[in-house]
Design a protein with these regions (language model features):
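Secreted/processed peptides and extracellular or luminal domains of membrane proteins
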Residues: 18, 22-25, 146, 175-177, ...
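Residue-level signal for mature regions of secreted extracellular proteins and peptides
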Residues: 5, 9-12, 194, 224-227, ...
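Cysteine-centered iron-sulfur cluster-binding motifs in ferredoxin-type domains/subunits
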Residues: 8-15, 50, 204, 234-240
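Canonical Radical SAM [4Fe-4S] cluster-binding loop centered on the CxxxCxxC motif
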Residues: 1-31, 242-249
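A C-terminal junction/extension of Radical SAM enzymes
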Residues: 151-154, 158-222
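Flexible mid-to-C-terminal extensions adjoining Fe-S/redox cofactors in radical SAM and related proteins
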Residues: 214-274
Length: 274
């Protein structure tokens, strides 16, 4: 198993508009831990829902010493959790989107990012490319604020998965990311600029362990699989292994061209100096 998402609960303390996982029935079973004990994978992520909601489930997962990372909204963070993350060497990912937090929740989230910093822990921020993000004013001001929080190592922008979305959303998101890429002048890494050079969304060996103990093939969002006709003859097939859950091409082609051009320019500059 190349990658496994382990979901101790679907319950969540947020109701993000682009996420429907919290609507699923939890139906937790002790079978969950029996299956987790048998799983062998180099990359196991605690996912949800919000995996920190039920402390004993979380601790039992970590005690297997198989968990490598956690995806958390970071609204729950205390001395015990910090100690657990440090002891088990857990990589942390958290998320932000314009409609994710109330004002008070956002303040708490930033406080907890600073707690990570104070305790020598690092994280990345995941941001879904939603309509409201593309129209969000003064996003650069947020980036400047986050750039001063040493716990934040990088930001990864991710394509929205929504079968009701506008058909040109991914194209507009690509152009939005390109504009941001041109202006990027921060300590924080823009991780999609790295990912776009090897866009591997292949989920053939990705699995999800659900709270009821069912182990299913695919990521937590898996519903149905699409094979797009445009992918079959695409000249970027060697670079892009697409997400088969997307019903519209989500590969940021314009960003890929920009990053490739910059890499070629940098290579030419090094060769000229040699």
């Amino acid at each position: 198993m190349r990658k496994v998402y382990v979901i101790p609960t679907y319950h969540c303390n947020l109701k993000c508009p682009h996420c429907e996982l919290h609507l699923k029935e939890d139906n937790f079973s002790e079978k969950f831990f029996k299956i987790l004990d048998d799983i062998k994978s180099p990359d196991i992520t605690l996912f949800g829902g919000e995996p920190t909601l039920y402390r004993e489930r979380l601790k039992r997962c970590l005690e297997t010493e198989k968990i490598s990372s956690i995806s958390t909204n970071l609204l729950i963070l205390d001395a015990e959790l910090i100690s657990l993350y440090k002891y088990y060497g857990i990589s942390i990912a958290t998320s932000w989107n314009p409609k994710r937090f109330t004002e008070e929740q956002y303040k708490l989230w930033v406080e907890n990012l600073r707690k990570l910093e104070e305790n020598g822990l690092k994280c990345i921020i995941l941001i879904t490319l939603t309509e409201d993000l593309l129209s969000y004013e003064n996003f650069n001001l947020l980036l400047k604020e986050w750039d001063n929080i040493e716990s934040i190592e990088g930001i990864l922008f991710e394509p929205l998965l929504d079968y009701q979305m506008s058909r040109d959303l991914h194209e507009r998101a690509d152009l939005w990311i390109c504009s941001l890429y041109d202006e990027w002048n921060f300590r924080i890494r823009n991780l999609i600029a790295d990912k776009v050079m090897k866009w591997d969304c292949n989920c053939s060996d990705v699995w999800t362990l659900n709270p009821n103990g069912q182990l299913s093939r695919g990521c937590p969002q898996f519903e149905k699989k699409f094979v797009l006709n445009e992918c079959l003859g695409c000249n970027l097939a060697g670079i892009c292994r697409p997400c088969h859950l997307q019903h519209i091409c989500s590969f940021p082609k314009n960003l890929y061209k920009k990053v490739l051009e910059n890499a070629n320019l940098a290579s030419s500059s090094i060769s000229a100096r040699a």
